[in-house]
């Protein structure tokens, strides 16, 4: 072959390219309407119609991209964004439910902590509107109080505080117990004569002497506290 063949072919190629850009309409690059914007098929056809010398639109090599895209049409591609949003909705709902469950778990733990919280006698309300109930003592507390009463029917304030701390009771509870115990002891020894007013056997005289100041105040409340216990 002569070199003129290649020159002529090259010249004809550039000539076709020149005619291509000369015949191209300026509106071919404008945006397509909304009905054609969902895919590139309609836009490609419109552009190809303006440049017939470039390629054949009807050729199977230049088919619409929707025809070769997994058998889906243009409508399927247009619904993809909505499908992605629908898939995110269950995730958002699950996150909200998880937050509610976390709050419920925190409330349950807080309630369990309050249930295990120990309430001491001095933490209870002592106002006039509080309904009083009968105080119950354990066997250990009763035994220690009986031992103390065997030696001293009347307690000093200092000794009362010591017993209250040792037995986890309040001073008022110690005072009421001793008042009721003295009333019981007086009823038991009512018919014994003048010796009933004496101290119990084994009592320490010095302790009775130091409790003389508290005796007058406690005897005034004996009958009232006895009625409360009954």
UniProtKB/Swiss-Prot annotation:
Example GO biological process: regulation of transcription by RNA polymerase II
Source superkingdom: Eukaryota
Keyword Nucleotide-binding tagged: no
Recorded GO MF terms: DNA-binding transcription factor activity, RNA polymerase II-specific; RNA polymerase II cis-regulatory region sequence-specific DNA binding
Region (Disordered): 187-230
Start-end of Low complexity biased regions: 194-213
Described purpose of this protein according to its UniProt entry: Sequence-specific transcription factor which is part of a developmental regulatory system that provides cells with specific positional identities on the anterior-posterior axis.
Protein name per Swiss-Prot or TrEMBL: Homeobox protein Hox-A7
Organism: Pan troglodytes
